[in-house]
Amino acid sequence: MKINQVVLIRHGQSEWNTLNKFTGWHDAELDKKGKDEAKFAAILLKKEKFFFDCAHTSLLKRAIHTLQYILDELNQTWLSVKKSWRLNERHYGALEGLNKDEVIEKYGQKQVLLWRRSFDISPPQINIKDKRFPGNDPRYSHLNIHDIPLGESLEKTAKRVIPYWNKIIYPELKNNKKILIVAHGNSLRALIQHLYKIDNKAILDLNIPTAQPIILDFDNEKNPIKWHYLT
């Protein structure tokens, strides 16, 4: 692995992916396919002799467990891992837990696609009295209640992801650390859009598959050059 690379991986398939539900901040488990995907991602990394100095993931178990499977396969379970809510999936608001086909039937394909893929359009917000509100979860008890999302666009997701990149991850890259980030489709989309200056219309077409390693290439000054999937 070159020192000027960062590896991104979306978590493996979850039980709610299989059920075709909007997952967001719901803490869905990996299903069997997702576990196998995580192990296969590690095999791809091992084949190319990737080795990491540090790893980052979200506070959601589908990402945490994907990372654990990968580190186990790479014989790096001892690696220091930083977990942050800032790498969580975007919050799907009132859509969380709903079947995507049923939502499409109710609101239409065009509207749902905008909620899912556009840059600045948020889904309907959740009410703080709703049992699904993350403020009820002890893992977010350290957050100011005003920082806990009620429903996010990609733009809002980026506003929490990018500061984490700038303050925590990028200094590690500047220090020549080899970095692995296991997170979620939209938190990774937000990061890729920011680094590679993808415009707000083009980002609509970017859909990141589960457990497919993405290699970010940087020049010697640690400026992003290109990105590609490891296959």
Curated annotation (Swiss-Prot):
GO biological process, one term: glycolytic process
Catalytic residues (positions): 11 (tele-phosphohistidine intermediate), 89 (proton donor/acceptor)
Entry binding sites for substrate: 10-17, 23-24, 62, 89-92, 100, 116-117, 185-186
Catalytic activity: (2R)-2-phosphoglycerate = (2R)-3-phosphoglycerate
InterPro entries (alphabetical): His_Pase_superF_clade-1 (IPR013078), His_PPase_superfam (IPR029033), PG/BPGM_mutase_AS (IPR001345), Phosphogly_mut1 (IPR005952)
Translocase among keywords: no
Swiss-Prot/TrEMBL site (Transition state stabilizer) positions: 184
EC number(s) given by UniProt: 5.4.2.11
Keyword Transport: no
CDD domains: HP_PGM_like (cd07067)
Pathway(s): Carbohydrate degradation; glycolysis; pyruvate from D-glyceraldehyde 3-phosphate: step 3/5
Entry keywords, A to Z: Gluconeogenesis, Glycolysis, Isomerase
GO molecular function: phosphoglycerate mutase activity
NCBIfam families per the UniProt record, alphabetical: pgm_1, PRK14115.1
Family: Belongs to the phosphoglycerate mutase family. BPG-dependent PGAM subfamily.
Function: Catalyzes the interconversion of 2-phosphoglycerate and 3-phosphoglycerate.
Subunit structure of this chain's protein: Homodimer.
Protein name: 2,3-bisphosphoglycerate-dependent phosphoglycerate mutase
The organism of origin for this protein: Buchnera aphidicola subsp. Acyrthosiphon pisum (strain Tuc7)
